Amino acid sequence: ITHATPASFIAHVPHRKAEEEIATYFLKTEIDFFLGGGKKFFDQREDDDRNLYQELKEKGYQVSDYFKMDFDDIVVNKNKNFAYFTANESPLPKSQGRDYLPYASRVATSFLKKRGQEKGFFLMIEGSQIDWGGHANESEYIISEMLDFDKAIGEVIDFAKRDGETLVVV
């Protein structure tokens, strides 16, 4: 969640590798829902002794992570902002068992629709490991990530069809 693409929507830092600094921006915003890797930049910090994971809870977020509970078992409270950490650092590739992206997309659209009935919402979903597979020149990695991302986008398109007022940009 602290990588360049998702972080660019909330954080403004001079370097993409400033992930501990990026993590602090999650406490400076009222982001409704976020899910992704990078837990260590919240609760195992090297630059200071802050526990941003705990600070999110104190700010009223419903916070959990893969160590405590599978994402499939989470009951999301629409009355609280939501944070779930899928990995301590970067999430596993799809080929190594990561299987939550389509389900998380469905949960996020439902949650955000309930939260933003009047004003609407913006949701950014990244298939970042497609790029990583490309850099590694690993075709199977790329294909498995693209298929997983396609399923996630399918969930969003299904939501948009039901909703009738949603624009999907891929």
Across the structure, where does each feature detected by a protein language model lie?
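His/Asp/Glu-rich, glycine-adjacent segments
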Residues: 1-115, 128
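Active-site His/acidic residue clusters
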Residues: 4-9, 89-93, 116-120, 124-155
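Functionally constrained cores in energy, signaling, and assembly domains
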Residues: 105, 109, 133, 160
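Generic beta-sheet signal
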Residues: 83, 119-125, 166-168
